[in-house]
Amino acid sequence: MYNQSPSRRSAMGAGVILALAIGLGAVEVQAQQTIKIAAGAPLTGALAKPGQEVFNAVQLAVEEWNAKGGVLGMKIEVVAADDQGNPQVGVAAAEKVAADASIMGAVWGITSSTCIPASEVLEKANMAFITPGCSNPKVTDRGLKNMHRLCARDDFQGPAGIIFAVNDLKAKKIAIFDDGTTGPRGAADEAEKQAKAMGVTALRYVLRAGDKDFRAVLGTVPKDVDAIYASVWAPDAALMAKQLPDVNLKAKMIGPDGQFEPVDYVQAAAGAAEGNYVTFFVPDMNKIPAAASFVKAFEGKYGQISSYGPIAYEGANILIEAIKTAGKADRAAIRDAVRASKHKGVLGMEITFDAKGDVATPSLSVYQVKGKGFELVKTVTK
């Protein structure tokens, strides 16, 4: 697994270093050879594949900047922060990042449960936090100055899945699942609200992430449901798809962004996911002229783009552009420059942030599982 170790820290206690880093706010960089940004994601564990794609995309952006001379006259270095998709681990990783005064900001997160506490650590250190995939509304509703989200919120994504189920699939009775964790539960909550608002019967269920047999819960679902909104991550969605026939459930699944994984979902389901639907934050990259060079470079180095890579790449470029705009290695100035960003990159649209730090013009694409991957069905904007 491609991974870059964090820089060595002094023998001082981590708490003392963190206090110094927060207190200083800026770091003298004239004598330095590099300037650092962090890439935070689950780099080990069940969500390592999408997490590693986040890191790889940030690394690619940095390599491209370095090939042009870096930023502020210095080369850029990526520091890996493995949060394992675990809130406690994420906080510890964020504390290490905040304690390193040479790290100017972070592109971080695909799990909201980890993103929320980790961003609070970096907020105290005045560090910009840009997330490519943490979609729970609470991420930005807290009003943090450092928090920036490039993906759509779950109060857009959850309803979009239900609207598609009702209007396009003509569903009238929908089973809604989540795994009990912050991100998936948030999308499921919003999906349930939308279903009730549309006069559709919504039945709620909870699965435990990582279980090897969901049939006891799946077997309680009425056989006449028209659709299944499954707000779970890709590995669990694959298992669900394989076990639905065992309990005589024939309805198609609709899932949020965490299922946009050709390997961990589609291929792991071994054909059982065929025809299911997934909403994701990125349109078909092969149809965006501005994305051609990115797609070629990324896939030439790391293989097929599967999920959060394009958004993380945008995040890294926004962060580095903010460092350039700030004109100095000052965390607070860089944080403020991120909030004022106007960036047009590989997603084919101008990215700006609203007062909360949400992307101002979110969009979602609905994909259908076909063969070993996904085919675009439609794109919806808020």
What is each stretch, according to the model?
Residues G13-G25:
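Bacterial N-terminal signal peptides
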Residues I35-Q59, A81-Q88, I110-T111, F177-R185, ...:
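Extracytoplasmic "Venus flytrap"
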Residues K49-N56, G70-L144, R208-R215, W233-A238:
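Beta-alpha junction/loop-to-helix N-cap segments that form part of ligand/metal-binding clefts
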Residues P50-L72, D189-K196:
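Short, polar/charged alpha-helical segment
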Residues V91-A92, N136-K138, K145-N248, V282-S293:
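Extracellular/periplasmic Venus flytrap/periplasmic-binding protein
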Residues V97, A101-I110, I130-P132, K173-D178, ...:
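Periplasmic-binding protein-like
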Residues A241-Y313, F374-T381:
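Extracellular/periplasmic periplasmic-binding protein-like sensory domains
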Residues A297-G309, I320-G373:
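Segments of small-molecule ligand-sensing domains
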